[in-house]
């Protein structure tokens, strides 16, 4: 501070404790303010002094360079090419001035380039080869649509088989609820497994309990395996209706389960399959294979964890639970069809609640939304056509693993 000519009257600067009366405080503040402005003036004077010196030196250098250029330009051709040093006394000054001027110009150009250059961050989305959903304390809601893919078929026989295969899922609204064993999806969407579930049709009030599965080495011919403790004379009619619609025969085989499955979702046989359909996705000649292949191409999954039973408002602008404002994200290629699905709405789910004698839940722990992750070829994705009629919304499948 002394070198710059600055002063200080702050007693606490040296670490001494002091007490002042009001008059002393005012006088000290006044003197401190005066010294502060004096120091500011000294600093500004120093800055101006060195700035003026720098500007004067810079102007002298520019003037020297200009004089050298004019001097060289005024010489004749013979003097410009002279080699002897004694006749070229100002050559060193010229080179030095030229180098300084080049450095200044280069620095200015590089500064302008740095201001106009912005780094571009690489953006790349991760690619997921496959996605697997395994058993857990979650509920999965599968919304299955019957996509009209007849535009891509030229063979009349294939169209007839396709129409026959969709008879089972041509109802206006179907709700299914039951237990989840495992759901697996791979790149080709060939692995497709359900757990136990009870299917209730809102229109016909029929019940079915079945599972769709495909395992390595399975018989390409369609077959159904039914638990003999479940199938009795009271509920055998729905299975006959399925046999008639898909033109196949179900085979009754015991599965080693001695616990009957309740249609009202209150009792379950843990870890056992009541009905199994084995199929091969590559077998395009079979109606069931065609049906399953179309199902694999056109459904979406929403997962959530719950306390008792599930109640949903679906196909709304922002779907929420009845007693909870927790949103559910509808994923997939069929979000634009929400306004056309008038047959499967809030009132139908309440009707299903009354028939099944379920109790509404007041507390949902948490909700998770899970997209179907699979890489498909563009040609295998069904077309995004709007539904032609209300029967295009074929089924809603709900299954869960256990109560929390």
UniProtKB/Swiss-Prot annotation:
Keywords: Membrane, Transmembrane, Transmembrane helix. It is found in: Membrane. It comes from the Eukaryota. GO terms for biological process: organelle localization by membrane tethering. This is Uncharacterized protein YBR063C. Its main location: membrane. It is a multi-pass membrane protein. The chain crosses the membrane at residues 35-55, 92-112.
């Amino acid at each position: 501070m002394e070198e710059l000519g600055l002063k200080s009257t702050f007693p606490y600067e040296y670490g001494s404790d002091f007490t002042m009366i009001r008059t002393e405080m005012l006088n000290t503040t006044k003197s401190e303010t005066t010294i502060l402005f004096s120091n500011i003036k000294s600093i500004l004077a120093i800055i101006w002094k060195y700035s003026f010196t720098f500007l004067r030196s810079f102007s002298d250098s520019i003037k020297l360079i200009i004089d050298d250029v004019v001097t060289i330009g005024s010489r004749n051709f013979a003097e410009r090419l002279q080699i002897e040093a004694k006749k070229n006394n100002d050559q060193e000054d010229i080179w030095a001035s030229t180098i300084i001027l080049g450095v200044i110009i280069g620095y200015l150009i590089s500064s302008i380039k740095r201001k106009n250059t912005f780094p571009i961050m690489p953006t790349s989305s991760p690619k997921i080869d496959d996605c697997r959903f395994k058993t857990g304390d979650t509920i999965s809601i599968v919304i299955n649509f019957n996509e009209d893919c007849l535009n891509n078929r030229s063979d009349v026989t294939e169209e007839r088989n396709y129409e026959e295969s969709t008879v089972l899922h041509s109802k206006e609204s179907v709700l299914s609820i039951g237990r989840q064993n495992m759901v697996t999806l791979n790149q080709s969407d060939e692995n497709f497994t359900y757990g136990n579930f009870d299917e209730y049709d809102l229109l016909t009030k029929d019940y079915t309990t079945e599972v769709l599965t495909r395992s390595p080495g399975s018989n390409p011919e369609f077959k159904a395996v039914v638990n003999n403790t479940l199938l009795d004379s009271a509920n055998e009619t729905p299975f006959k209706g399925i046999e008639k619609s898909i033109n196949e025969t179900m085979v009754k085989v015991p599965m080693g389960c001695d616990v009957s499955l309740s249609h009202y979702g209150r009792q379950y046989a843990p870890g056992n399959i009541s009905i199994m359909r084995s199929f091969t996705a590559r077998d395009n000649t079979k109606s069931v294979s065609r049906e399953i292949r179309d199902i694999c191409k056109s459904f979406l999954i929403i997962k959530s964890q719950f306390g008792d039973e599930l109640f949903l408002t679906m196909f709304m602008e922002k779907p929420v639970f009845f007693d909870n404002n927790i949103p559910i994200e509808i994923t997939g290629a069929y979000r634009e069809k929400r306004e056309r699905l008038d047959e499967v709405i809030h009132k139908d789910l309440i009707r299903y609640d009354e028939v099944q004698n379920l109790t509404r839940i007041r507390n949902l722990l948490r909700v998770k939304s899970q997209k179907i992750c699979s890489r498909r070829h563009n040609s295998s994705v069904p077309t995004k056509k709007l539904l032609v009629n209300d029967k295009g919304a074929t089924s809603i499948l709900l299954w869960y693993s256990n109560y929390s």
